[in-house]
Amino acid sequence: MDKQSSAGGVKRSVPCDSNEANEMMPETSSGYSDPQPAPKKLKTSESSTILVVRYRRNVKRTSPEELVNDHARENRINPLQMEEEEFMEIMVEIPAK
């Protein structure tokens, strides 16, 4: 046979063993496997779900005057009213299926 070059640049007079025409390739799996059972559905409750989310607004105070004014404001306002101003509630009702 003619001399052939290998990857390293060395000339060989015979082809590599892995290049033989009658070499058998190992069979690979076709990707099919036993089917998995479908996940069981969870039972839904009869009542609806209410989600309440509360968060506090981010209030930035930049000067001491604002702090003094804020304290005066706090003294004039009922604490329950202030809580209503500073907190917001979000209610979501999810109907039962």
From Swiss-Prot:
Predominant location category: cytoplasm
Extent of motif Nuclear localization signal: 37-45
Tissues of expression: Detected in testis, melanoma and bladder carcinoma.
InterPro entries for this protein: SPAN-X_fam (IPR010007)
Segments forming a coiled coil: none
Keyword Nucleus attributed: yes
Keyword DNA-binding: no
Keywords assigned by UniProt, alphabetized: Cytoplasm, Nucleus
Pfam family, one: SPAN-X
Example of a GO cellular component annotation carried by this entry: cytoplasm
Region (Disordered): 1-47
Subcellular location: Cytoplasm; Nucleus
Recorded family membership: Belongs to the SPAN-X family.
Protein name: Sperm protein associated with the nucleus on the X chromosome C
Lineage of source species: Eukaryota, Metazoa, Chordata, Craniata, Vertebrata
Gene (name only): SPANXC
